[in-house]
UniProtKB/Swiss-Prot annotation:
SMART domains (UniProt xref): STI
Coiled coil: none
Source species taxonomy: Eukaryota, Viridiplantae, Streptophyta, Embryophyta, Tracheophyta
Identification of the protein by name: Aspartic protease inhibitor 3
Naturally occurring in which organism (per UniProt): Solanum tuberosum
Disulfide-bonded cysteines: C30-C75, C124-C134
Domain of life per record: Eukaryota
Protein localization: Vacuole
Keywords associated with the record: Aspartic protease inhibitor, Disulfide bond, Glycoprotein, Protease inhibitor, Serine protease inhibitor, Vacuole
Record-level GO cellular component terms: vacuole
């Protein structure tokens, strides 16, 4: 299974790779936040792997995202992306780690073509359990960026989703 870096298409302060970092005020024993570096001239991002429900990775299908890094046993679950609970300050949900692979929960995402350039990430709760006849994307939310303690944190947004490309590592 290949690893990729998720790279923001923007340049300068609008650019920057996605990485695993420590969430402010978190008491988790491992890094547990999904962030984007503040500039495209910053360090390289943390590699990820995409784990599809089926055998291959395609656009617009449910998948899990996992930071693909060596880690101690205690921190393995802190590599799998999920959407956290509502953050009152930001009035949205922040992306964090601690998700589960293959479970019907808040750990499912999709990669879709951006309306501008590149791709967007969507958070998509596993909807077949919620609503058997609903269009699948009805429950999906766009992933963008909020500023948390000077860091760019990935979060669910209504506007300005993060436009990204994927670089195989």
């Amino acid at each position: 299974n290949s690893s990729y870096r998720i790279i923001s298409i923007g340049r300068g302060a609008l650019g920057g790779d996605v990485y695993l970092g420590k969430s402010p005020n978190s008491d988790a024993p491992c890094p547990d936040g999904v962030f984007r570096y503040n500039s495209d001239v910053g360090p390289s991002g943390t590699p990820v792997r995409f784990i599809p429900l089926s055998t291959n990775i395609f656009e617009d299908q449910l998948l899990n995202i996992q930071f693909n890094i060596p880690t101690v046993k205690l921190c393995v679950s802190y590599t799998i992306w999920k959407v956290g609970n509502l953050n009152a300050y930001f009035r949205t949900m922040l992306l964090e780690t601690g998700g589960t692979i293959g479970q019907a929960d808040n750990s499912y995402f999709k990669i879709v073509k951006s309306s501008k350039i590149g791709y967007n990430l969507l958070s998509c709760p596993f909807t077949s359990i919620i609503c058997l006849r609903c269009p699948e994307d009805q429950f999906c939310a766009k992933v963008g960026v909020v500023i948390q303690n000077g860091k760019r944190r990935l979060a669910l947004v209504n506007e300005n989703p993060l436009d990204v490309l994927f670089q195989e590592v």
